[in-house]
A protein has these predicted regions:
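Cys/His-clustered metal-coordination modules, chiefly Zn-binding fingers
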Residues: 91-157
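Interaction interfaces in information-processing and related assembly proteins
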Residues: 2-97
């Protein structure tokens, strides 16, 4: 079998998670959500602006020995609603699913209204409700009713 010289192969991971179909350019934000930093001790592979039939261009993050929590999935969904998760075990995909935008977000997004009670020293957690999903997902603050685009919102990490 002949391999296309322009194709780059990245080795498989034994156990972990592959986050695929990330909005192009958003891989660094996904890494922040997942707490991946320079001192991360497992294998982390990031591919950015990869050609995609589905999205035109996409980012991919492969993480060995990392399984995602529900909070992580919700945060990823807010910045990359078309992302897919592949759970890997013994080098095989054992589960594959798409993220979905949560109806309610608590303590995930920061309200852009600096006067909102969720930004005060009162210790009130942010609380947003999904307003609509197309063309861009937008969430409305429960307290001040500020509308925020999910892909431009500041995440609370």
């Amino acid at each position: 079998m002949e391999q296309d010289a322009s194709e780059l192969k990245v080795s498989k991971i034994r156990r972990g998670t592959v986050v695929d179909h990330i909005t192009a350019g958003m891989a660094p934000a996904v890494l922040r959500i997942l707490g991946i930093h320079a001192g991360f001790s497992s294998v982390a592979v990031v591919a950015m602006n990869v050609k995609s039939d589905k999205l035109g261009y996409k980012d991919i993050v492969k993480l060995e020995q990392v399984m995602l929590t529900e909070d992580m999935l919700q945060m990823i969904a807010t910045i990359a609603p078309q992302a897919t998760m592949n759970v890997i075990d013994d080098f095989q995909i054992v589960e594959k699913y798409e993220v979905s935008l949560p109806e309610v977000l608590r303590s995930i997004l920061k309200c852009p209204n600096r006067h909102c009670i969720s930004n005060s020293s009162e210790g009130v957690a942010s609380h947003f409700a999904l307003e609509h999903t197309a063309p861009i997902a937008e969430y409305r603050c429960h307290y001040c009713e500020e509308l925020v685009q999910a892909d431009r919102a500041e995440l609370i990490l």
